[in-house]
């Protein structure tokens, strides 16, 4: 296991430290393991999961605080760009072309995995295109540093990130990942699909075997595609179900659109009563959510269906889900056009 190998190296180095060197608790330039919240974290991990206390402390001693991450997390919210501008960023000609090439390079795997999980291949490709430009940009922060920094030096979300740090330690134990070299985003998301440790452990699958150990989500493309498909499948993706539809809008002036709502709290019929006509033939009782999708020339709206909601479970943003859908359609069209 990677954990045991890394710990043997770490503990050997500690054993060879010269007399008078800083003790383990001092953690020079790192985290002070005597801090109450860190000591409590170690106690919990050891008692809940049976990990060796010395092993856990040896790994945490290697974590380095990252002030830049705290700066990113506390940065004032900038003016939100309009949807059309957000869309242009993610639907560049380059990203569409790269997506089509990626699809053709992995055509057989995409067909098999799409059939197995009943998720269209274009959505698997689009998610990877938006998350990491098809695996090219997976993050440069050490995951150990990122998670420890947010777990112990970022009070607003320390509970969430302590849980993810705990999950990362378990992932290290179960996989071949090296805790000292594994890199990811500033929030600790990993690999081509940008899975957090808890998601990695729960949804990552090996496409070609029944092995239970977590797969490589950086270079094993069958596992990467299967893991994204499995994630969407587990959240209830409906085969052949719609994702988005355009609208014709003449709304009731009293009708309020909730800008951050992702829940399917309307139906096609209820929207119709407020002057919103859905440009897709679906039953009137179909649950939907109305989404603002402003264009260069003014307001516009779309409706999201169940599969749209499923995409927001990957990233809780309506604009993200719209971008995934639009990139999926653009890449699929490019692939179709190139083969006709």
What are these regions (language model features)?
Residues 179, 183-296:
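Flexible, glycine-rich surface segments
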Residues 85-229, 233:
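Acidic/His-rich structured neighborhood in mature extracellular/periplasmic domains
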Residues 8-18:
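Bacterial N-terminal signal peptides
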Residues 64-65, 131-135, 189, 238, ...:
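Solvent-exposed loop/turn segments at secondary-structure junctions
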Residues 283-340:
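C-terminal functional modules
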Residues 27-28, 32-37, 44-62, 158, ...:
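A contiguous strand-loop segment
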Residues 1-9:
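Bacterial N-terminal signal peptides that target proteins for export
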Residues 22-114:
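An acidic, Gly/Ser/Thr/Pro-rich helix-cap/linker signature
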